[in-house]
Amino acid sequence: MSQGTLYINRSPRNYASEALISYFKLDVKIVDLEQSSEFASLFPLKQAPAFLGPKGLKLTEALAIQFYLANQVADEKERARLLGSDVIEKSQILRWASLANSDVMSNIARPFLSFKGLIPYNKKDVDACFVKIDNLAAVFDARLRDYTFVATENISLGDLHAAGSWAFGLATILGPEWRAKHPHLMRWFNTVAASPIVKTPFAEVKLAEKALTYTPPKKQKAEKPKAEKSKAEKKKDEAKPADDAAPAKKPKHPLEALGKSTFVLDDWKRKYSNDDTRPVALPWFWEHYNPEEYSIWKVGYKYNDELTLTFMSNNLVGGFFNRLSASTKYMFGCLVVYGENNNNGIVGAVMVRGQDFAPAFDVAPDWESYEYTKLDPTKEEDKEFVNNMWAWDKPVVVNGEDKEIVDGKVLK
């Protein structure tokens, strides 16, 4: 009986899943998203990886899928090796896999996407990511100075997933000089990559000969001024029909057509970043906010019943915000994750230029996975909701029940 279908794209996040299926001969069909017609209807998020199992089981998020696949391994000793033999080992394996999935991968991804021109380049953000990468590498080095593997005495799912995350960086933005500074991490990485379990998917990983870096776009050469036309030529040009006139340039973003606002969004973003939120920043915001220029929306995730671990839900928010990068100059807001593992949700408040949410949000492919409700700050309950979403210091009220905020992201 088939054990399911795994929908993937080409990403190091999927190396461990592919390895488990191949090495342990699991009866799981691997489908490339580009070759699938049914994927979008099965998984509304349209994000890979995704797994369809027996009896309608649906899983998203790489870690959840890998833990499920590892549990399908028939050999009990192999299962214990991959997942841990007791609660301490299991917790350590989840700890290292989670650290790699959330922190290592995300901090590598932002510089990579910036250098490739896929998201706007921000030097401050990129530098902060490299500092975090070095700090994470130091944590791995400290463990691997005395141990062969990250979580237990044997290669585990923690190693498989973490090595996949580091592979992304080592093949792109982490060049020879960086690798030379981290011999323990590199010894571990090479050991895991050579393991029979992951040898096949890791065979395509080529360490970067030179680190990928940011290349500023080339400035276009200014056109030479044309020679002054004679009076006769000018008259001839004036006589041309209006159809020959050059068409007006369209705005790069629909919201650009609204022009500049009296409310300076960048001033608010700096205020929010630099001052205490509730006592200082929020009073400043309400004093300067112009509801004729901006509107505020309650944004809620439609598929909370599909969410599992809270850090995965937060990663989902981070990905959504990354895909909104084309609109961030017209937006500000927060989405928070409330609740606990296997019982959590995503909600928040986002301010956008204009009175319609769609032009700001529809730049993200998954924008329809969220529902949008316009808020009226003249109503005390709506204003307080915005305050709470942006301050993160009070529980979220869901169906009359208080739910603690466990994580969140700021869109700015």
Curated annotation (Swiss-Prot):
SUPFAM superfamilies hit by this protein: eEF1-gamma domain (SSF89942), GST C-terminal domain-like (SSF47616), Thioredoxin-like (SSF52833)
Any single biological process term in GO: translational elongation
Superkingdom of the source species: Eukaryota
Pathway: Protein biosynthesis; polypeptide chain elongation
Alphabetical keyword list: Acetylation, Cytoplasm, Elongation factor, Protein biosynthesis
GO molecular function, one term: guanyl-nucleotide exchange factor activity
Domain named EF-1-gamma C-terminal: residues: 251-412
Domain GST N-terminal: from-to ranges: 2-77
GO cellular component, one term: cytoplasmic stress granule
Residues where N-acetylserine is found: 2
Record domain GST C-terminal: where: 86-217
Region (Disordered): 216-253
Residue ranges with Basic and acidic residues bias: 220-247
Pfam families named in the record: EF1G, GST_C, GST_N
Compartments where found: Cytoplasm
Other remarks on this protein: Present with 102130 molecules/cell in log phase SD medium.
Known role: Subunit of the eukaryotic elongation factor 1 complex (eEF1). Probably plays a role in anchoring the complex to other cellular components.
Assembly mode: The eukaryotic elongation factor 1 complex (eEF1) is probably a heterohexamer. Two trimeric complexes, each composed of eEF1A (TEF1 or TEF2), eEF1Balpha (EFB1) and eEF1Bgamma (CAM1 or TEF4), are probably dimerized via the eF1Bgamma subunits. The eEF1B subcomplex with the GEF activity is formed of eEF1Balpha and eEF1Bgamma. TEF4 interacts with EFB1.
Protein name in the entry: Elongation factor 1-gamma 2
Organism: Saccharomyces cerevisiae (strain ATCC 204508 / S288c)
Gene behind the chain: TEF4
